[in-house]
Amino acid sequence: MQSLAAEQFLPRVDRKFDRDNLHNVSENEKHILIMNGWFCHNPVDCFPPSDSIVPVFVGFHLYGEKTQDLLTPQCIEYFKKHGPIGCRDRRTMELLAEKGIDSFYSKCLTITFPKRTKEPVNGKVFIVDADTIPIPQSLYEGAIHVTHSVEDLFGDEVKAALAKKLLELYRDEGSLVITTRLHCALPCISVGLPVIFFGDSSDSRISLLKDLNVQINRMPNKYLRGIYRFVNEVPRNREWGKRFRKVCVPVFMRYVDWNPSPIDIKQEKEHLIDATRDLIAQKISLSESIKS
C-alpha cells in the first residue's frame, strides 16, 4: 500500500530498489526515491543509502530496538544533508529533532489516495486481520475475511498487484472495514470508507490515527478472545459462535462504535499532497543543478 501511494507522485517509475539494500545500490544515474515507511529490517545494508539515491523523506518512521542503528553519526549526517524529513508520527519527529535534524510531522502517504466518487449499493463488510475480534452477528454474517499477510514465495510484482486489487475492492465494494492493520485503515479512510480500528492507543506506530480523529478501540482481553476463538473456529461450535455474537458481543464490546461514519481528512490529505510535491520538485531542481 505504501508503494502504491508513493507511485501516485511520480511521473513514471524507472527502477525499483530493494528497501533493505539501499546502501549497496550502484547506478551511473541518480534516482529520486520516496522514502516512506520503516527501514530497520536490515539497517546495515540499508542506511545510509548510496549516492545513487536522491531521497525524498515523507512518512518516514522509526520504531523498535534497531532505531539506534539509524541514528549513528553517519546516518545523522545523512539526514541533515537530505532534509527536511517528513515523519509518519510525532515520536519519530521528536527523535530526529533531538539530533538536530530538520524534521516535520507529515503523517503517512497512504492518506493521499483519491476519495471514491460514489458508495456501493449493498456494500460489503471487510474483516481484515481481525478474526480474533468478537464482532456483532449483524456485521459478521456475510462479511468478507481478508489478510494482508502474503507469503514470501510471491515476488514484489505479485504483492504490488495484490495490494492494488485489494484497495480497489475496498473502494468499490466496501461499506465498512474492521481491522487491526494501520495500512489497511489509512487507505480505506482516504478513499472514504468508515473504519473500525483495534489496537494499542499508546503505540507510536499507530498514533497518527488519533490525530485523524480515528477511534482506536482497545483489543479485547485474552480470555474473551480465547472464548471467541473456541466458539468461532471449531466447526461443531458454530451455532454457539452465532449466539455469542448476538448476545455477548453487544455487552462485552459495548465501548465500540459499530456504526461509524467516514472521517473527513480532506485538509490533511491536501496538505500532505502539496508538501510531497514540493519536496519532489526541490529534489528534481537540485539534481538538475548538480548535472549542469
What do the PLM-derived regions correspond to, one by one?
Residues 1-292:
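Active-site anion-handling motifs in enzyme catalytic cores
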